């Protein structure tokens, strides 16, 4: 299956380093076989664990409004930086910086293994949602329930890409840009202004402040950031080879495996990159076989946990009640 070895449990305090967030004193680290994962932990250590996964371009601050209601509910809340972002590092200095979907999904399982979490609940969006989908589909024994922001987003990275409607292709301009050398150089030279532009385009009704963006922007200074981002968007468009360890996993993902764990699908009504949320369809119900609910969140774009944290927290608590 291409599954990596379980993570080794190593918790440590972290010093400030390039790409570290301003509140680095709150961050802990744990080693897996591939990553040193930076994460924040809140709530009771005895509470049932809930893992919250951010996307690109973002970091753990995306969940600041979601964490408190979960902690009040008695849960243990774990918020890791995904590979290439913030306090998370690829441990081998000579390893290629890859971030295909199978790697991101395995990172979640490795994180849970390193923390000795037999089961957990999960919510994610963007890259984080894809990781949540993959873990729920391939490891249903580990995932109690999931809130999938963006619905089912597992990709077929093996088949020939099919063109979308012109307006959808325009919204994905950044992917075509990243598939060029100019795009790689542009991201390296302009990572903060480019990421801020994506925030503005993807959540057009969200009026975030300079302070909000600046709390997260240092996470884009991670030395693995550019290579991981470029690989992610090239690999999904057949522009880069994947990690040989995940060949079998990508084959399984290309077959659209069902997610049989209880889930709630959330969509931002004003998502500038995902587009207008699709109408409920048999195809989604077919892959989300135990879906509890499907909701379009008014007043939110792509960054739903930042824009409407109460909707995300409420959905998570609903999933937890339904899976007692």
Question: Residue ranges of each PLM-predicted region?
Answer:
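Conserved acidic functional residues
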Residues: 55, 126, 306-307
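N-terminal export signals
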Residues: 1-12
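Glycosyltransferase donor-binding loop in the core domain
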Residues: 58, 221, 301-304
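A short loop-to-beta-strand scaffold at the N-terminal edge of the catalytic core in hydrolase folds
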Residues: 33-41
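Flexible "cap/lid" subdomain of the alpha/beta-hydrolase fold that forms the substrate-access gate
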Residues: 20-25, 36-37, 49, 85-123, ...
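Conserved beta-strand scaffold positions in the cores of enzyme catalytic domains, especially
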Residues: 27-29, 77-79, 263-265, 294-296
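Conserved HGGG/HGGXW glycine-rich cap/lid loop of the alpha/beta-hydrolase fold
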Residues: 41-90
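Catalytic active-site module of serine/aspartate enzymes centered on a nucleophile-bearing elbow/loop
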Residues: 290-324
């Amino acid at each position: 299956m291409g599954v990596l070895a379980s993570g080794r449990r190593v918790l440590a305090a972290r010093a400030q380093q390039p790409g570290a967030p301003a509140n680095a004193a709150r961050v802990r680290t744990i080693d897996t076989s591939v990553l040193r994962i930076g994460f924040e932990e809140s709530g009771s250590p005895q509470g049932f664990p809930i893992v919250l996964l951010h996307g690109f371009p973002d970091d753990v601050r995306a969940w600041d409004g979601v964490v408190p209601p979960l902690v009040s509910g008695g849960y243990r809340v774990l918020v890791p930086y995904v590979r290439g972002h913030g306090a998370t590092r690829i441990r081998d200095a000579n390893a290629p910086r890859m971030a295909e979907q199978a790697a991101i999904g395995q990172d979640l399982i490795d994180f849970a293994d390193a923390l000795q979490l037999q089961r957990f609940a999960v919510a994610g969006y963007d890259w984080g949602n894809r990781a949540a989908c993959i873990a729920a589909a391939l490891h249903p024994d580990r995932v109690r329930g999931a809130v999938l922001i963006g619905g089912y987003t597992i990709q077929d990275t093996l088949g020939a890409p099919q063109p979308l409607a012109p307006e959808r292709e325009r919204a994905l301009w950044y992917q075509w840009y990243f598939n060029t050398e100019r795009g790689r150089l542009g991201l390296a030279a302009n990572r903060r202004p480019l990421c801020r532009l994506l925030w503005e385009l993807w959540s057009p009704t969200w009026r975030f402040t300079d302070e909000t963006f600046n709390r997260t922007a240092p996470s884009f200074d991670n030395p693995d950031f550019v290579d991981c981002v470029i690989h992610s968007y090239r690999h999904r468009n057949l522009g880069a080879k994947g990690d040989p360890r995940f060949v079998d996993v990508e084959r399984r993902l290309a077959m659209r495996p069902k997610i049989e764990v209880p889930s709630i699908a959330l969509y931002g009504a004003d998502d500038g990159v995902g587009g207008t949320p699709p109408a409920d369809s048999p195809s989604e119900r077919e892959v989300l076989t135990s879906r509890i609910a499907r909701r379009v969140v008014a007043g939110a774009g792509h960054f739903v946990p930042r824009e409407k944290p109460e909707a995300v927290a409420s959905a998570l608590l609903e999933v937890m009640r339904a899976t007692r």
